Amino acid sequence: MAEAFIQVLLDNLTSFLKGELVLLFGFQDEFQRLSSMFSTIQAVLEDAQEKQLNNKPLENWLQKLNAATYEVDDILDEYKTKATRFSQSEYGRYHPKVIPFRHKVGKRMDQVMKKLKAIAEERKNFHLHEKIVERQAVRRETGSVLTEPQVYGRDKEKDEIVKILINNVSDAQHLSVLPILGMGGLGKTTLAQMVFNDQRVTEHFHSKIWICVSEDFDEKRLIKAIVESIEGRPLLGEMDLAPLQKKLQELLNGKRYLLVLDDVWNEDQQKWANLRAVLKVGASGASVLTTTRLEKVGSIMGTLQPYELSNLSQEDCWLLFMQRAFGHQEEINPNLVAIGKEIVKKSGGVPLAAKTLGGILCFKREERAWEHVRDSPIWNLPQDESSILPALRLSYHQLPLDLKQCFAYCAVFPKDAKMEKEKLISLWMAHGFLLSKGNMELEDVGDEVWKELYLRSFFQEIEVKDGKTYFKMHDLIHDLATSLFSANTSSSNIREINKHSYTHMMSIGFAEVVFFYTLPPLEKFISLRVLNLGDSTFNKLPSSIGDLVHLRYLNLYGSGMRSLPKQLCKLQNLQTLDLQYCTKLCCLPKETSKLGSLRNLLLDGSQSLTCMPPRIGSLTCLKTLGQFVVGRKKGYQLGELGNLNLYGSIKISHLERVKNDKDAKEANLSAKGNLHSLSMSWNNFGPHIYESEEVKVLEALKPHSNLTSLKIYGFRGIHLPEWMNHSVLKNIVSILISNFRNCSCLPPFGDLPCLESLELHWGSADVEYVEEVDIDVHSGFPTRIRFPSLRKLDIWDFGSLKGLLKKEGEEQFPVLEEMIIHECPFLTLSSNLRALTSLRICYNKVATSFPEEMFKNLANLKYLTISRCNNLKELPTSLASLNALKSLKIQLCCALESLPEEGLEGLSSLTELFVEHCNMLKCLPEGLQHLTTLTSLKIRGCPQLIKRCEKGIGEDWHKISHIPNVNIYI
């Protein structure tokens, strides 16, 4: 890594020497000599990096060079910071503190120059060859959509495992566990994913859960993760182990589930026995699939013969390599093919090796570069279990300089951790790994670097959620990154401190990352770039925080702090301040606007924030502002957003404080093309402007057409803005509008071509249809298809709503999968919802029955929930038409007297029936005994059914005796 950071330092020195600040204190010659000395040393670094692998003295020399490099970087950084501060003062170079500062810098420069001369002299002992430094490989253009490559050579294995799982008939007490066993890099996780997503598996199991276990086999953590996976949401608050166990058993009880435990290392039999005891409540055929490298793990956990994964054939390895190295290139150099096949032989049939080697060579088309990989001495180094580590080391050594340290830095994240791309880029920036190129923003440079590492197969399992990109590293790739850091440790120059839930020290390439419970004296860490105190119990920052002149990244996520010290505003180099979910924080320091380098002010979830610091608009570097609380006074108003080029998402609150549309226009939202998510809210409990003014204000807050997510809360205007009827929302994917009681009609949302999720909560009692326009008379987009992309529709509390469309046509809601109806007593379903798979009807306090034809055209409905319909006495017989229905839940329907005899007989796919708190339900229908697919029946809080369903003697027992899992609760 030394050569990578030296290149960064040289670029910084070159840029600095061209500027005016270097002239301020008269150190131009000294900095020039430093630059020349580093250039001389840099010429031999590539050779040194390759030879250090089996040369301890050379490794020590590189460590000394590393330490000196970071020391020079500190001097340069401090010089620029102080020089900027002095130049902006009224005294300029005649500031009284200039002379002592010059003396201090001069002394440090002399000391580091002596060190570098000794290091330069020592390099002669190693007979290193000079090489021309390759600055950067040619970058290829990439799109924003990232897809996993095709899987080669594993179809046979997938089919065999699927058959084992589907044909498993063991009962719950003998829970089947199938381990997939194989060395690292063979593709165990990929194979498990193929099985998990196979259509046959999806149809066979009632529930599928995927858990990445890694090295921490903690029962409580795993049970919590399984519960969260099943429920699809995080558990709020802490729960003890016993209630967690009970909750999991309730969720799994009577279900034929598939649980995948990926990457298991636990060799403690008792730990597995404890977890297995909780899992033994499922239906016959419930299974656990594990992946592991360790035979002992397979023997401890497995009840079935471990499935040993073999190496890929040379042919499949070649196909995988070729797909990565050549892509869809039509003409391929036959000489490269010949060399490539020799390289693939060295990969030993390990997919990860073939994939990464192909990934690095896809940027190289010179035969010499391919021969260099084939003939590298790294192949001859001692190996552990396979040829994978030499292949991965080669992949690293082939990276351009600017990618090497960015990759190795990822070692600071725990193994198997889900990483956030945007956060990682901010951390790269904080450590100075990214340099601006032309007019490109640093964030865009970081995005390019990230994409290149992804294309070279260093990153995997890409997931995009809420506008953010998450990813993982294969554990062997993570091991490589960690080994690179460990080889370049410098304990004298700590640049990053993390607070985590465990206490130990991890060596990394440019410093050490320190993990601790109590905050140490910050003055000990003068070189600190990153301070990570996320989720800590600290409720106060010391005033010495202002002395960390190099600090770029401060993470206080989830801390209990109520305020921040004013000394924080002395941090001129601070780029990221993460205050997300600091729920007690009520204000920021008044001089926050002095943080001139601040790029990310993250405030999501800090709901106690009552105001913004004044003049936040002067932070012209600001790219991310999670929240903006509107104020009434100048310096606190919406106009502060006007000149900011914001990225990502922003939540604007207290819009009732905006006086008029003129003030709203000053926010200049229509020019912010890099915003993808916008939330706007009014507080209806304080002083309020007139409703007519609110319409004008919202009209003036028209966003840019690049927006993909829009949320509006508490709007009291009489109609929504005109820009909702327009192509302004042509890229919108999700809309949520809540508490807008005065709007008597809705915009034509059916026009929006990309809209996938529409949530309308607490609307006007005057609204009768979600869309009232005629199909052929609408603005914006010339299409007859209404809601062409909508997948989720969630409607709450529209007291007069009759239907979705006033005029129905054949082409409407073609892909609508999920629908939630709350407190809409008169709403009838459209006649054409062929794609609908999930329907929830809740809080209908009026209807005593549903329309007879209500469920007639829902041919693909799989999940139906009817809840809190207090006066509902019967269900329509059209229930029988739901041939695809797998789960039926009827909850808190206090007046329901019976289930339809004919309505249940047609449910030929039903596997789960749950009836809860239906006090008036007198008996179960005869048709239940004909439902041969039904495996789980749960009845709770139905007093009249308890005796009738008593095992063996109850009047209704014969109707349900064939069901494997029957649970009846008081």
Swiss-Prot record:
Residues engaged in binding ATP: 182-189
Residue span, NB-ARC domain: 135-438
Keywords: ATP-binding, Leucine-rich repeat, Nucleotide-binding, Plant defense, Repeat
GO molecular function annotation: ADP binding; ATP binding
Disulfide bonds: none
One GO BP: defense response to other organism
Highest taxon of the lineage: Eukaryota
CDD domains per UniProt: RX-CC_like
Induction annotation: Constitutively expressed.
Coiled-coil blocks: none
UniProt repeat feature LRR, residue ranges: 525-548, 550-571, 573-594, 595-619, 638-662, 672-697, 752-777, 787-811, 813-832, 833-857, 859-882, 884-906, 907-931, 946-970
Signal peptide (residue range): none
SUPFAM superfamilies named among the record's database cross-references: L domain-like, P-loop containing nucleoside triphosphate hydrolases, RNI-like
Uses described in the biotechnology field: Can be introduced into cultivated potato (S.tuberosum) or tomato (L.esculentum) to transfer a broad-spectrum late blight resistance to cultivated Solanaceae from sexually incompatible host species.
Extra remark: Belongs to a four-gene family located at the same locus. Although the four genes are expressed in the resistant haplotype, only RGA2 confers the resistance to P.infestans. In the susceptible haplotype, RGA1 and RGA3 are likely to be pseudogenes created by deletions and mutations, while RGA2 also contains several modifications.
Role noted for this protein: Disease resistance protein. Resistance proteins guard the plant against pathogens that contain an appropriate avirulence protein via a direct or indirect interaction with this avirulence protein. That triggers a defense system which restricts the pathogen growth. Confers a broad resistance to all known races of P.infestans.
Family membership noted in the UniProt record: Belongs to the disease resistance NB-LRR family.
The protein's name: Disease resistance protein RGA2
Organism: Solanum bulbocastanum
Lineage of origin: Eukaryota, Viridiplantae, Streptophyta, Embryophyta, Tracheophyta
Gene transcribed to yield this protein: RGA2
